[in-house]
Amino acid sequence: MSAERYLNHPTFGMLYLVAPAGEGRDVYATLYAQKMFFLVTLQPRGAQFEVIPFLDARHHAEIHLSRCRRENSPEKDRWQELFHQTFI
């Protein structure tokens, strides 16, 4: 991942990418109040936002981080740092 990804939520403002969640979905968190998490599905005509609990967001991030470790991804350190900044 070469650059951070952001989305603009119509009510909660800027969201940043926390982790891919699979099946064309990603987990995003609010930029200024980091404890709101969304499962976002990008669609041709916009985005679908689903609020998810902290532990669900963390679970998706842990799964992604485990996959990066298993595949020895060059982005592993970046995802590890983002995980710690967001959840620890």
What are these regions (language model features)?
Residues F54-I88:
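Short, compact, well-ordered microdomains
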Residues M1-L55:
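Long, non-catalytic architectural segments outside compact domain cores
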